[in-house]
Amino acid sequence: MSRIGNKVVVLPAGVEIKQDGNNITVKGPKGELTREFSSDIKMNIEGNEVTFIRPNDSKEMKTIHGTTRANFNNMVVGVSEGFQKALELIGVGYRAQVQGNKLTLNVGYSHPVEMTAPEGVTFEVPANTQVIVKGINKEVVGELAANIRGVRPPEPYKGKGIRYVGEFVRRKEGKTGK
């Protein structure tokens, strides 16, 4: 059984936290994140260490305990280091361009696909077949990267499509002729 909720979250230098009822605000060098947490879980701050305490050991409380700690840790890592997801475009003529906060993908459709970055998220295109999504909120970065991948998921026969860097795509054999 996981015991993530019992682990201590160590605050790096330059990260401040503020608690206002159930809302916790984490402020750091990269930005500021606010999130509402369960009122059942109590937060205990000692110096630069934060622990979370649950009222009882019921299964429901254990799940909320671990989730609360993991979400808080993601907020701390996000405002101090940030998160990024890298994608690659594989296919003839597949390319990406960024203009301001708009990403334009040419991935074999009759029209280019445009995506707009939400607030706090940026796109980088180091090469015209690579896209890097960066931001401080792990959930938003992951969801946006998944939406970009969903425009043209990798297909199993030729391997064409948009995939995460390092993602393994299981290949299939084509039909065999007579």
From Swiss-Prot:
Keywords: Ribonucleoprotein, Ribosomal protein, RNA-binding, rRNA-binding. The keyword Ribonucleoprotein applies. Coiled coil: none annotated. It holds the Pfam family Ribosomal_L6. InterPro entries: Ribosomal_uL6-like, Ribosomal_uL6-like_a/b-dom_sf, Ribosomal_uL6_a/b-dom, Ribosomal_uL6_bac-type, Ribosomal_uL6_CS. Part of the 50S ribosomal subunit. This protein binds to the 23S rRNA, and is important in its secondary structure. It is located near the subunit interface in the base of the L7/L12 stalk, and near the tRNA binding site of the peptidyltransferase center. One of its GO terms (cellular component) is cytosolic large ribosomal subunit. GO terms for molecular function: rRNA binding; structural constituent of ribosome. PANTHER family: 60S/50S RIBOSOMAL PROTEIN L6/L9, LARGE RIBOSOMAL SUBUNIT PROTEIN UL6M. This is Large ribosomal subunit protein uL6. Gene3D superfamilies: Ribosomal protein L6, alpha-beta domain (3.90.930.12).
